[in-house]
Amino acid sequence: MFARRYHALALFVTVAACSGKNAESTSVASAKVLTIATPADADALIPQLVQSTQGKQVTDLLFDHLAQPTNNLETVGDAGFKPQLASAWTWAPDSLSIAFSINPAARWHDGQPVRAKDVQFSLALYNDAAVASPHASNFIGIDSISVRDSLTAVVWWKHRSPEQFFQIAFNLAIVPEHLLAKEARATLAQSAFAQHPVGSGQYRFEQWTHDRQLIVAADSTNFRGKPNFGRVVWVVTADPTAASMSVLSGQADVLESVRGDAFVSARKSPQLHTIEYGSLDYAFMVMNTERTVSGNRRLFGDRAMRVALTAALNRQAMVSNALDSLGAVALGPFTRSASSVDTTMRQIAFDSVAAGRTLDSLGWKVDATDKLRKKNGKALKFELLVPSSSATRQKFGVLIQAQLASIGVSVDVAPLEPGMFATRLEKGDFDAALNMWRADPSPIVSLRQVWGAPHGKEIGANYGRYANAQFDATLDTAALVFSADKRKALFRRAYQLIVDDAAAVWLYEPRNFAAINARIEPTGMRADAWWADLPNWNVVGSRVATAKP
């Protein structure tokens, strides 16, 4: 269902057909429309449940946070933030609480005022075990939120930490209590609100045709002002070639990541900007440490096995083959742009001979008849999931398959449409998978969410169920240290621990180039969220569709 090609005529007929729904729609029906070609549909439209980049793009436009980061993405203190839902804030003398003043003009899209109790309710929803939010770990250390009055929410912490303000302002999306309080928490994803969300952002929800397109419309009376585009439309274009052609031909305005031949064509096109916007993305092969593979319980739970597979792969050769100059070998669960990173840290080097010796020592011997490594009559074989929407990860899957075959390891590459790929990761129904993660500006938040030890069924985004007590303890210490030098040293120690432990095979970090129609002047394209300032993007001309190249 994600293989549907983009049809410009169908898109514009659908958008126009929405114009008669209500006065709000009528006022923006003929306004400027921004069309985004996206490789996958949103996974959810409730912030507490969203895990995909596409879902995050939509919910960031529909819902507000207390404050918004500036482009420098500073995570210590509050200097790197500007007001969003909160018009002001006041620190307590002991820094254990912050009182946020809600803008009295803020309204939900149903007309109801936003109140402090909505802030309190939103945190409770993230932390409710029945909701099972993958973002619950982002709020570790926050004691509670109290309501001082209808427009003042006070956030309380158990301990002081350098990233207190960032922790609450960046991570807490505010949702309406009056519409969600009576919804069953365990089935929130199936609620009516999940299909027709109501936020307080500069865009309001309009239409969602699953696996095809999603539309939001400008909230013309929003307290932060009317955005420049009357509508934003995401068109699901799972085929990477079709997605590239849609922007090259002028049928779509934005493709957030363009690579290969499409990048060369986009560079040459006078109708497009190719804009590099930084990267907090890294790709890796996650291994399910609890899975029985090749007849061996917890095969990837063995560090020696993970190290052997890492050493068997020539990652530099793979990056050169698949990305050329548009990527670099990943060093760990971070990107080189992070200030906490030491790029000279020790790595597991490519050494296929050493990898073979390790596998021999683990009892996986090469069978002379078929050249496969076997143990107790079982071949060393695993399934590798890749999302069909990512041409780059599909290339890496084939390259990994070939390189591991050379040392007697059999890999079955299994492309899956994005929805099924995500579902199997979340359920733990996989041997290994090629995943991509957009790191949080805070190393504490990202590392806990993706690599912190699971707590029972609460795994966050740690799909491989990886656990390392030393790593977790080092992160916990770093979270409370105010000295910049000491924090950096602790982060380096944590990074070295997880790299030495081969928690994953760190594959690549891409250089992110967006292809954007030349009629548009984008602003504020942050490395963590290129869409962050989308309501303020400028339009300097009209879209002109051309014949497909």
Where are these regions (language model features)?
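N-terminal lobe/hinge region of extracytoplasmic solute-binding protein
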Residues: 37-93, 124, 196-202
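Ligand-site clamp/hinge motif
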Residues: 191, 218-265, 398-402, 408-412, ...
